[in-house]
Amino acid sequence: MNNGFFNSDFDSIFRRMMQDMQGSNQVGNKKYYINGKEVSPEELAQLTQQGGNHSAEQSAQAFQQAAQRQQGQQGGNGNYLEQIGRNLTQEARDGLLDPVIGRDKEIQETAEVLSRRTKNNPILVGEAGVGKTAIVEGLAQAIVEGNVPAAIKDKEIISVDISSLEAGTQYRGAFEENIQKLIEGVKSSQNAVLFFDEIHQIIGSGATGSDSGSKGLSDILKPALSRGEISIIGATTQDEYRNNILKDAALTRRFNEVLVNEPSAKDTVEILKGIREKFEEHHQVKLPDDVLKACVDLSIQYIPQRLLPDKAIDVLDITAAHLSAQSPAVDKVETEKRISELENDKRKAVSAEEYKKADDIQNEIKSLQDKLENSNGEHTAVATVHDISDTIQRLTGIPVSQMDDNDIERLKNISNRLRSKIIGQDQAVEMVSRAIRRNRAGFDDGNRPIGSFLFVGPTGVGKTELAKQLAIDLFGNKDALIRLDMSEYSDTTAVSKMIGTTAGYVGYDDNSNTLTEKVRRNPYSVILFDEIEKANPQILTLLLQVMDDGNLTDGQGNVINFKNTIIICTSNAGFGNGNDAEEKDIMHEMKKFFRPEFLNRFNGIVEFLHLDKDALQDIVNLLLDDVQVTLDKKGITMDVSQDAKDWLIEEGYDEELGARPLRRIVEQQVRDKITDYYLDHTDVKHVDIDVEDNELVVKGK
């Protein structure tokens, strides 16, 4: 009978299952359970022997009590604190913590709060990277040294990982049990102080929702905090403190706020000096004082989105790691192993009377031994200020290397390079060049953008092109140019495109395309406000703050730094013929479009001149160079006669429209005709362009 259940395959599976079941009935595979807990045969035998004539229930109770005693011996409340956290005080005794410099005030204030009789729970509030955790480590070191009030001289600071309290809590009540064990551990030790980094995470941590009745960590800790049964040190940022802790009034009043501000540049240098020995020992790299100062100065200037001392320490660590990788230390174990192998080879060579070979091996052994002696605990590399500059350049992509002779010459010649690309606008080029030289040489005030300029002039004379060339010359690519067409910012909601929407409006959480977000990601940029006269007046109001203070606050309250940007506004309003006598007339015309306080914020207001035919001679050469770049991809060379250039200038010259008509003529008469010729002669390697019968002709070779 053909049956899906009863066939040979099913029979074999059934027989195998029966064999497994029979095997499980053997003595070695039996499992024993008492009150739902699995016990081994040895534990059962011991329990039976201890139980004697007692009933099964009494024997089970005895077993549970024995198990609880064993658990208490192996992982009691005191041990539980060690399981879920680090004893910072013990680490301070063992010398495992970095020294804490310049935070005596905050450490003293934290110690005073801890020594209170009630509400002795300090919470360190400060932005990310200012050293909140370091202050707690400094307090642990102060306890070890005895530089604290008598009330807390015997305290042990336990850094608790909140995630370890939640780990493995798959059943209802397991998390609450962990918290109770934590509280009991603190009570039994009588001298433990818990440290919660990122303490805002305790809000709702472990809770499963209001309907289930399961409480979170903060709800369980509140009674113990109010009675003074446990003492907690917390650390969090200003935003998280405002958004989480302050919303819970009952929790807030149990903590005492200790503000942690960013240290000054001078204090940060002292901090780096204090931890220098640790980094030198770790990386085997010498770190002089001027390197430490460069870490602070360059990180302040080029990493504005982060705070001291964290960013300066990171720059120092990255630099030392980079130098250490370039000068790897001698592997002592491998070298000694190699010496041992060579000793054996030498003995074999001597036994075989190969004395020349033995002598060569001895020389190699001597070389390895010298290498071991020379590398014994000595620094193999010395960091320089130039190394710090290279690190900043790798982190930010900004060319900030220390100015050498080549850099100085490059700064001197920036105006010449820009003039070669921007034809006929020497005044504008010189004004922008002066601002760049002043900034790169370090002689600007540092509290405003590198430069802010208003370019006024007719269309097609190079206003936008100067901004593009400036981005390429300074930052190496045209992507450093942030171009905003002000015709898109003429409505009343345009401000949201600049700084993002405010709370309560659609798009509040998505500000990725705003100007402030672009500058935050690329703080070194050229910002071009094209045709600024078309912008909404609210946009101009925002620019007042940017050009005066060098910063702007976005819709989410973040302060964005514009101090490393160049701001260029272009306008067609009030342009004249470029004569000095007409400058007052130009300002008069611009006042019809812009308020005086807006015009007064610019470093310079530059009039772009009309282009004459002499200027177009240089422009046509630039346009033809662009054509040659395209032809190079095809392996084609090009020669253009002077007659052809003159013909292009004559056809493309328009005083009112500037260089754009010339660009169109080159596009139509040169690029298009070369394209047509190439399609008919795909093997062409060279083209000549000339004028015949008042027409441009292309001939190939």
Curated annotation (Swiss-Prot):
Residues 47-57 have a biased composition (Polar residues). Residues 336-371 form the UVR domain. Residues 47-79 are annotated as: Disordered. Gene3D superfamilies: 1.10.8.60, P-loop containing nucleotide triphosphate hydrolases (3.40.50.300), UVR domain (4.10.860.10). Residues 81-332 are annotated as: I. Keywords: ATP-binding, Chaperone, Nucleotide-binding. GO terms for biological process: cellular response to heat. ATP binds at residues 126-133, 457-464. One of its GO terms (cellular component) is cytoplasm. Belongs to the ClpA/ClpB family. ClpL subfamily. This is ATP-dependent Clp protease ATP-binding subunit ClpL. It comes from Staphylococcus aureus (strain MSSA476). The gene is clpL.
